[in-house]
């Protein structure tokens, strides 16, 4: 079958790469894709927002399945437009994508269906939010309601820090409309893990658990980012805890979505806190994580195209999804100044080719002449593969020694929690 991937980041590079080696897939298109994705997909210069052009292209080229990578097109309703045109889509409807598009929607739904998460309040006014903060005390978590590229969360260790975050968001300075409503949550103690799942509207098949590293600096210091590295499988989510998360979080949420008249199709991403009381939801995302995708997909031992088509057509079964008995680690190389600002146009030197045991996924690069240059933010995701996590990490960091660009920054402690 022919598959089209929407997006151009590291996650989409990983999706296109994995689909291109799936037995059921004969052709991969990427809209718009990135220069490096031409190695595994045909790039198509169409804007997904021009739905008439997009649908014409998909029909003329007899594309069987569309895989939507980023959250913005999903929250904007791209899946609805394509489904209406009779094109199968791996990705949720606009209504279902509210799980990520609105923190308030997600929290209210979890409360209604008794899905374990942190206690919370919802606020539109600064003074009311500050009163809640004063009553609750710190540490406390302040979240912008809408999409903020993974940066709309402040874990405030003091009341002053929480108050400043509320003022920043509700004034509209930080995230515009996305921050016009805030969710304030109790601080949950524990270790975080990401559990993604394939979903076809009813059936939920969990993927291998991974762990992201959100903070920019070693030791989980500095501001939040879109993610500075991941590894899988994550030992913090034992088989027993994974089953518990499936039974108490993922399956109930998918059942709730169906009951609410917005069945969920695609990848459901549960960001979890593993507390003393068991797994609780930190957040839901309506798509593959970035950079979780870069470690989860290399460990898949099944046909990704077949799985995604089954999700899109309501025919998913657990036996379609098998995993390799090995490990993967991804270290993000970010540009100078990230996440506050980010440098662009710096030449990337060294070896960024693909090998059997290391893969380099491009998050933010451009091809200028013969050279790849940085294009801001997270630049590359260097993935190491191995029989165990130590081997995978050694391969990823070993590979980084042969890559360089001006102001390159990365964490040296990805995966450290797995060895505690």
Place the predicted regions along the sequence by residue.
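Active-site nucleotide/adenylate-binding loops and adjacent lid/helix of ATP-dependent enzymes
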Residues: 4-5, 100-181, 211, 235-251
């Amino acid at each position: 079958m022919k598959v089209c991937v929407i997006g151009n980041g590291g996650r989409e590079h990983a999706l296109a790469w994995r689909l291109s080696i799936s037995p059921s897939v004969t052709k991969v298109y990427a809209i718009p894709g990135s220069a490096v994705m031409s190695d595994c997909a045909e790039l198509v210069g169409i804007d997904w927002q021009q739905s008439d052009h997009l649908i014409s292209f998909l029909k003329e080229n007899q594309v069987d399945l569309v895989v939507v990578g980023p959250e913005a097109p999903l929250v904007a309703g791209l899946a609805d437009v394509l489904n209406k045109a009779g094109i199968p889509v791996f990705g949720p409807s606009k209504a279902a994508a509210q799980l990520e598009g609105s923190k308030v929607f997600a929290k209210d739904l979890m409360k209604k269906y008794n899905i374990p998460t942190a206690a919370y309040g919802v606020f539109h006014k600064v003074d009311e939010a500050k009163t809640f903060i004063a009553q609750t005390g710190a540490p406390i978590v302040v979240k912008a309601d809408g999409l903020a590229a993974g940066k709309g969360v402040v874990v405030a260790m003091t009341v002053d820090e929480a108050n400043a975050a509320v003022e920043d968001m509700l004034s509209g300075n930080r995230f515009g409309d996305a921050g016009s409503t805030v969710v304030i949550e109790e601080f949950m103690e524990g270790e975080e893990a990401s559990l993604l799942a394939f979903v076809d509207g009813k059936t939920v098949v969990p993927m291998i658990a991974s762990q992201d590293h959100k903070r920019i600096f070693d030791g989980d210091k500095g501001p939040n980012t879109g993610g500075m590295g991941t590894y899988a499988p994550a030992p913090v989510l034992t088989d027993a805890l994974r089953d518990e998360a499936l039974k108490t979080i993922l399956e109930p949420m998918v059942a709730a979505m169906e009951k609410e008249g917005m069945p969920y199709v695609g990848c459901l991403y549960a960001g979890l806190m593993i507390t003393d009381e068991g797994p609780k939801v930190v957040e839901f995302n309506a798509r593959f994580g970035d950079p979780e995708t870069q470690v989860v997909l290399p460990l898949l031992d099944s046909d990704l195209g077949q799985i995604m088509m089954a999700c899109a057509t309501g025919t998913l079964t657990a036996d379609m999804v098998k995993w390799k008995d090995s490990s993967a680690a991804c270290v993000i190389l970010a540009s100078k100044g990230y996440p506050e600002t980010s440098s662009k146009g710096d030449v990337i030197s060294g070896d960024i080719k693909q090998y059997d045991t290391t893969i380099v996924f491009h998050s933010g690069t451009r091809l200028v002449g013969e050279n790849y240059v940085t294009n801001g933010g997270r630049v590359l995701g260097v993935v190491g593969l191995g029989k165990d996590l130590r081997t995978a990490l050694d391969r990823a960091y070993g590979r980084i020694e042969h890559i360089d660009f001006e102001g390159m920054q990365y964490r040296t402690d990805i995966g450290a929690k797995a060895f505690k």
